[in-house]
Amino acid sequence: MRKKKNLKIGIVMDSITLINIKKDSSFAILLEAQKRQHEIYYMEMNDLYLRKGQSYATTKSIEIQKNQNNYFKFIQKKDISLNELDAILMRKDPPFNTEFIYATYILERAEEKGVLVINKPKSLRDCNEKIFISWFSRFTTDTLVTRKLSKIHNFWKEKNDIILKPLDAMGGKGVFRIKKDDPNFSVIVETLTNYEKKYCMIQTYLPEVQFGDKRILIVNGKPIPWSLTRIPKHGETRANLAVGGEGRVQKLNDKDWEIANYLAPILKKRGLILVGLDVIGDKLTEINVTSPTCICEIEEKKNISITGILIDYIEDKIYK
């Protein structure tokens, strides 16, 4: 093992000016890194660029603190080669669009030069958070991915109660429930598919959502033993915290462990080091790989440092 040094850790995220530090997982990760004396380099997606095949970014070194009124301070702004960093956390929220994909190409050039990128850029492209569950259909409800109105209509008539989701969003955005004989079926489907120009996901509605949508975190191939169960507010189909769901920390049950233990080594092999599984009842509904959340809520209630496990992994990889 080589002599330990203070690491240079970059992060690509949405504007830090807009976060709630009590709930923001990216902030919690940076706080743990700073506590260990590592240098933090802040970037937004439009700061990344390529020149002569080399990846660069306009970075800001940053200091942070737990004070919502004054929680960050930029120290120095400069352009650097991403090769100068030891690790980069790609924590940009969806939409998962072509701009996001282009950013992963830039990060992949740094990865090829030896920079540790979490999560692995290629796997961020390959593992769409909605579609990726199709590789694990033994754990999912009946799921259709299509942009054909006729196929969605037939699925609806077969199931009577369905959920429709865009493939590139997050936080419950654009999610619709269509019950039997809903007169709004056509307008919802036409809007989501943009008149058969965009794919969407259609799933059988799971009534168990009234008891919560569980977020199960997996770090470096190991499931965290507690989930954050998000309970929908009254009259709401979606349980996401972003739309008013209530969070409760609960132990994983036997089915949760079965799903998490099956997926964990597969995710690690793909370089997906920090992942959030969404489970309703005993069904896997999404695999969140871009910027999984709910770290703060679990750490607040339980004696576990999820951020510490992640930074331990980064240090072990760099120091080995």
UniProtKB/Swiss-Prot annotation:
Binds 1 Mg(2+) or Mn(2+) ion per subunit. SUPFAM superfamilies: Glutathione synthetase ATP-binding domain-like, PreATP-grasp domain. ATP binds at residues 156-212. Its EC number is 6.3.2.3. HAMAP family: GSH_S (MF_00162). It holds the Pfam family GSH-S_ATP. Keywords: ATP-binding, Glutathione biosynthesis, Ligase, Magnesium, Manganese, Metal-binding, Nucleotide-binding. It catalyses: gamma-L-glutamyl-L-cysteine + glycine + ATP = glutathione + ADP + phosphate + H(+). It comes from the Bacteria. This is Glutathione synthetase. GO terms for cellular component: cytoplasm. Residues 130-315 form the ATP-grasp domain. Its cofactor is Mg(2+); Mn(2+). Gene3D superfamilies: 3.40.50.20, ATP-grasp fold, A domain, ATP-grasp fold, B domain. Mg(2+) binds at residues 286, 288. Belongs to the prokaryotic GSH synthase family. Pathway: Sulfur metabolism; glutathione biosynthesis; glutathione from L-cysteine and L-glutamate: step 2/2. GO terms for molecular function: ATP binding; glutathione synthase activity; metal ion binding.
